[in-house]
Each structure stands twice: as structure tokens, then as C-alpha cells.
Amino acid sequence: MEEVVVGGKERKRPRGALVGVGGGGASAATAAAWRTSRVARAAAGGKDRHSKVVTSRGLRDRRVRLSVPTAIAFYDIQDRLGVDQPSKAIEWLIRAAAAAIDALPSLDCSFALPAAASSPPPPAADDAEVSTSETSKSSVLSLANAPCDNGGGAFAELLHCSNTNGSKPLQQQQQATLAYYAAAQSAHMAAPMSFEVMAMPPHLAFSQEQQQHATVAAFDRGTLQSNASLWPPPPQPPPSQHPFLLQRFAAAPAEVAGLPFFLAGGVGGAAAAAPAATTNGGERRLQLWDFKEERKT
């Protein structure tokens, strides 16, 4: 605040409010510093487009709405002054009415200045982080309300990563099955087998592979809602070992410990399952019958 004498009376007014008016006015630098300290920026990065100013009644917007007659009279004055900016016309009006302004009662300018006014504005790179616009607020709220768990992850992760994770156990299972049968063949089946093998015909295995590829293709191009019916993917059976089993059993028949073997769909449909025969005191062996030869007899 600064004290001025108007009409023999001492009055107080904001420091540097009227530069160059009256006898004891402050310098232009002091007035500029005083005005700058009263700016409360609502947007960062040096943008004062939506900034407010500190007044004796709190923060106020710099934008002023005028009535229709006042706006017409004001723009007429601006046109007569020949200035392009409305603020230039306002400054001319304040200087012209300096005597009348000094006669007004003084203001209580003991208000506290904002803490951010004395600090330099942040760089323009931080605009997206500290902006208080409605768009940024809605974006921050949407990010804050987003789920944090990995179970409901992004659509791309659900589409690709889960499919990849589901295919790894299947590949490991297929490799383990092939290794097991290879080890069993090298041992020449010394111990009696006590398990049941369900082999799948080649044409059925091929149709299931086609169905699997079609399911994966539909899952990749579908939406998240449509993929709900396709998830989780159905378990895939191990690869067909039917030709391998036929060749192995034809070379060395295996002993059966009470359970018959069921083999379906031979090559060309010629081979079929046959009941076990009892020989040598109840010993059962697997025998492959040729029904064509049997029909001839």
C-alpha cells in the first residue's frame, strides 16, 4: 500500500495502481512487480489465459462481462482512441479518471498473496501434469478409476498372451507323450502293460485340428464380448498315435493284464479290434484279424 494526499486528506491505495498519476506515484518497475505478484495462475506453463487476480474480496476473473449499453459505449471509445486491444482503452479511462479515483475511499489491501505468485512458473513441458482444465480432470479420474489387477488386463494381453500361455502346456504334453512311447518301444515292452490306449482315427484328428484353427482365428478377430464364449479354449487331445501303435503291435504283440485294447479306424478301414485269445494256461495276447481272409474261408 502507498499513501497519497487527495484534497488535504491522506488516503491509501494499492501500490503502483496508477503509474504516472499524482505527485508521489511509484515507479513503473514497482507497479509491474506489484501487479505480477497479484496474479494467481490457474493454468501452468506461463499461460495466463485463464488466470485470476487477487483482490480485496478474493480471487476474481480477468474477463469482465459488460452490459449491452456499456459494451457499445466502450467499443466506441476504443475505436475513437484507435487502439486494437480493449485493455489499452481501459488503461486510458483509468488515467483519465485518476482524480475521481483518488477521491474514492481506500481499500483494505492487507490480503495475503498466493504462494505460487512469488515462484517462477513451471516449464511448458509440465503442462499435461499440472493442468487443471476439465479435460485433464476427466482424464485423471478415468485413469484413477481404472482396474489395477492383472486379471482383467488389456484386450491385447487377453488376446495374445493368454493364448500363448495356453499353448505351452499343450506342446510340453505332446513332447512328453512322444518321449514316453519312444522309451517304451526301445525297452521292447518287457513289462506287461496295464493301461488302456484310446487311439483316434486320422480323419477325426484332422477335423479337430481344423476346428482348433478356426476357433483360434475367430478368437483373434472377435471383440472382447464375443470372445467370452470362446474363453477358456477347450483342451486339445494328444496327437494320434494310431499308425505308430499298429506298426508296433504288428511287430511285437503285447501282453494284456486283463483289459482288452480298443483300436478304431485302421488304414483303409481294414483293421479292427479283436477279442483277446486265451492260450498257454490263460495267457492272453493281442491278435489282429484280417476280416477279408475270414470271409473268404
Swiss-Prot record:
Residue ranges with Basic and acidic residues bias: 282-297
Pfam families: TCP
Subcellular location: Nucleus
Keyword DNA-binding carried by entry: yes
GO MF term set: DNA-binding transcription factor activity; sequence-specific DNA binding
Assembly notes: Forms homodimers and heterodimers.
PANTHER family in the record: TRANSCRIPTION FACTOR PCF8 (PTHR31072:SF23), TRANSCRIPTION FACTOR TCP4-RELATED (PTHR31072)
Function: Transcription activator. Binds the promoter core sequence 5'-GGNCC-3'.
The protein's name: Transcription factor PCF8
